[in-house]
Structure formats: structure tokens, C-alpha cells
Regions:
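Thiamine diphosphate
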Residues: 1-164, 169, ...
């Protein structure tokens, strides 16, 4: 059996920007002295006149992006999630969100999988922060195919968009030939009748692997890829609640304010069901190899399998 192809979604981001740049001369890319890490350096090599390095000044970068958007161009402001969503939150809120400017934020190195950089750089709060901003679209793609499609969709959408990418190479689970991305539209990857796993980002592949293990125990798990956290596909959540009555959310993010919280909002108001949230449990991360951290914090396939099995039983 051939080995599954793995690509970090930050690589996908860089490649997608180059392809879009060839088609759209109004696309401008900004970075904050991290072009090699965020992979926007790919765009810089091809279109140096449309790449702006703002230096280690993320707040200023967001302000510059807002100004560029005000002229009618489409800026993609890029940095680590900790800096793009954390350090620059005020500027994203007041300079981009409030005036409803057409700025796209490409946030790489999100979540615990940043690895050795440690807790100060492992942003497990960005989804929570960004989804509170009125009008902000929040997208967390699961793999290379989806990430590229998400960047294209973000460009085409008029208004602020937050794109979340990872440092760790993850399995390519979507077929590029027939994949279709739609903002706010979840994708059912596996049918099931006993429990529904709603996952986002790199946790989609982990959840699919967990579902395979559950099947061996005669537990039928539906797996839904919720790539867009905002606007959330409420219809998919309501349907899952009616179908299985048990929902498990899985995210490489704090269980507070992220995908799990968004799903619970819908369940509480529209579709009563039992829900379990799997994610980072109100704690900071630590330095270590990404794969080991994912396992330690209970976000790997084996951990998901064990938690879902106990939840269903």
C-alpha cells in the first residue's frame, strides 16, 4: 500500500498565493519578517513588487493591509497565528473588522502542533478571538487540497477572512479532482449512525483514523469536516443531532470558544443532543515534537477513539 502524502497547510498557502497572483494583479501579500516560515516567500520570489515586508511589526502590518484594501486591492496579511490573531487583535478588530475592509489574514503555525517553539507561540485561542469579530469569516482547512481552495475562496469573498494554517505536514485526505469548497458548507466524509464526529483542521484526518478503529468495535461513526467555523454550517449540526443524537467535536484549539463552543451554541438553541468537546483543555502548551504533543494533549487518533468509545457506551 502506498504511503499517504503529507503536506503542511502553510506550504499550501504559499503555493496558492503564487497561483492566484498569476491571475489577479490586485493581490498583494504582506508579511512581518517571517516570509520563509509562513511560505509567503514563494510569492515574493515571483512577484517582488507585490510583496511587502513590514518587519517585526504585526500591528502595523494589519494597518498597512487595511490601507491597501481601502484602495481597492486585495491584501493577504501573513504571520504566525499568535501574532496575527493575538498581538494584532485590536488592529484586526478596529482597522479591518469595524470598517468591513477586504483584508485576508493568513495565520500560520496555529495550535499545539507548532511544536518546539513552545507555549508562547502555540496559539490555541485564535479561533475564539476571530469568531467574535462581527463579519469575520473563519476557515480552518484540513489538508493541502482544502487549504488551496480556501485561499481562492477567501480572495473571491468580499470582506475580512481569517485563514488558519499549520506547521506540521498532514495527510492529504481530499481528492483534488472532484473537491469543491464552499464557505460555510460542511462536508460529510464518512457516514455513521451511532455518533457524529465534527472535526476541523488537522483533526479531520485524526478523526477519520479514529472512526476506522471504532468501526472495528462495531461503533458506526459519522465524520464531518467543519472547515468553516464562522459562518458555521448550522444545518449540518442540526442534522447530525437528529441522526445520531451524540456529537463529538475535535479541534487543535482550546475547548473554550472554538469549534466545540460554536457547535454547542447551535445544539442548545436548535437541536438538543449530547455533546463532548475534544481539544486543548484550558491549559497552555509546551515545547516538544509536534506529533508527541498531539498525543500528550489527547488529540491523536488513538485518544479520540478511546474518548468517543467511552462517550458512546
Amino acid at each position: 500500500m502506498s504511503e499517504v502524502k503529507k503536506i503542511a497547510t502553510r506550504e499550501s498557502y504559499g503555493n496558492a498565493l503564487v497561483e492566484l497572483g498569476k491571475e489577479h494583479e490586485d493581490l498583494v501579500v504582506l508579511d512581518a519578517d517571517l516570509a520563509e516560515a509562513t511560505k509567503t516567500g514563494m510569492f515574493k520570489k515571483v512577484f517582488p513588487e507585490r510583496h511587502i515586508d513590514c518587519g517585526i511589526a504585526e500591528c502595523n502590518m494589519i494597518g498597512v493591509a487595511a490601507g491597501i484594501a481601502a484602495t481597492g486591492k486585495v491584501p493577504f496579511a501573513s504571520s504566525f497565528a499568535m501574532f496575527a490573531a493575538g498581538r494584532a487583535f485590536e488592529q484586526v478588530r478596529n482597522s479591518v473588522g469595524y470598517p468591513k475592509l477586504n483584508v485576508k489574514i493568513g495565520a500560520t503555525h496555529a495550535g499545539i502542533s507548532v511544536g518546539e517553539d513552545g507555549a508562547t507561540h502555540q496559539c490555541n485561542e485564535d479561533i475564539a478571538l476571530m469568531r467574535t469579530i462581527p463579519g469575520m469569516i473563519v476557515i480552518n482547512p484540513s489538508d493541502d487540497v482544502e487549504a488551496k481552495a480556501a485561499v481562492k475562496a477567501a480572495y473571491e469573498h468580499v470582506g475580512p477572512v481569517y485563514l488558519r494554517f499549520g506547521r506540521l505536514a498532514v495527510p492529504v485526505i481530499n481528492d483534488n479532482a472532484d473537491y469543491k469548497f464552499e464557505i460555510g458548507k460542511a462536508i460529510t466524509l464518512r457516514e455513521g449512525t451511532d455518533v457524529t464526529i465534527i472535526a476541523t483542521g488537522l483533526e479531520v484526518s485524526e478523526s477519520l483514523a479514529a472512526a476506522e478503529k471504532l468501526a472495528a468495535d462495531e461503533i458506526s461513526a459519522e465524520v464531518i469536516n467543519m472547515h468553516t467555523i464562522k459562518p458555521l454550517d448550522e444545518a449540518a449540526v442540526v442534522a447530525a443531532a437528529a441522526k445520531t443524537g451524540k456529537i463529538v467535536t475535535v479541534e487543535e484549539h482550546s475547548v473554550i470558544g472554538g469549534l466545540g463552543s460554536a457547535v454547542c451554541d447551535v445544539v442548545a438553541e436548535k437541536a438538543p443532543a449530547k455533546v463532548m468537546k475534544i481539544g486543548v483543555n484550558d491549559t497552555f502548551g509546551e515545547s516538544g515534537p509536534a506529533v508527541e504533543l498531539i498525543k500528550k494533549y489527547g488529540l491523536d487518533a488513538d485518544s479520540i477513539y478511546a474518548k468517543v468509545k467511552a462517550f458512546v457506551k
